[in-house]
Regions:
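ASCE P-loop NTPase motor core, strongest for the SF2 helicase catalytic module
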Residues: 1-175
Length: 175
């Protein structure tokens, strides 16, 4: 968590890569909780595979029950209802604004709505999904304003220059 805090304080993005099951989710939740405790209310966007979303929500509720979290998924109509009820586009962000947890597919479908926010942090679970620079997900994520990015992966990074370049270019587009 201290490493993620250091990244934030230095205005850097990062990749948290270790073996599966070593606590990347809980560490990230602890980090976002730290930011909120310092007055950085967000908004925060966590995206990942559909199969991990309920775990993210339950871990937020378990470790940081005071932080509102929204599982932003469902049919187009269900998402529209959630936008109206939970996701005001007014500024500034208030303490009750939830951490948005959603899937890659919903980000691509609702990119125009999500682009209305200036996210303080974008967390991409299973970040190795971005190893192909030409993938649609990377193209859509570029349109969502984000101050900081963190990729999480339990899959070893391959010694493959195009894949590494894609991940690093997503994190550091100006370098």
């Amino acid at each position: 968590v201290n490493w993620m805090i250091s990244l934030y304080q230095n205005g850097l993005n990062g990749i948290l890569a270790d073996q599966m099951g070593l606590g990347k989710t809980v560490q990230t939740i602890g980090f976002l909780s730290h930011l909120r405790s310092k007055g950085v209310l967000g908004p925060y966007l966590v995206i990942g595979p559909l199969s991990t979303l309920s775990n993210w929500v339950s871990e937020f509720q378990r470790w940081t029950p005071s932080i509102p979290v929204l599982l932003y998924h469902g049919t187009r109509q269900e998402r529209a209802e959630k936008r109206i009820e939970f996701l005001p586009t007014s500024t500034p962000i208030k303490p009750d604004f939830p951490v948005i947890v959603t899937s890659y597919e919903v980000v691509m479908a609702d990119r125009k709505f999500l682009a209305k926010y200036n996210f303080k942090y974008l967390v991409v679970d299973e970040g190795h999904r971005l190893k192909n620079f030409d993938c649609k997900l990377i193209r859509e994520l570029k349109y969502i304003p984000t101050a900081n990015k963190l990729l999480l992966t339990g899959t070893p990074l391959q010694n493959n220059l195009p894949e590494l370049w894609s991940l690093l270019h997503f994190l550091l587009p100006d370098v």
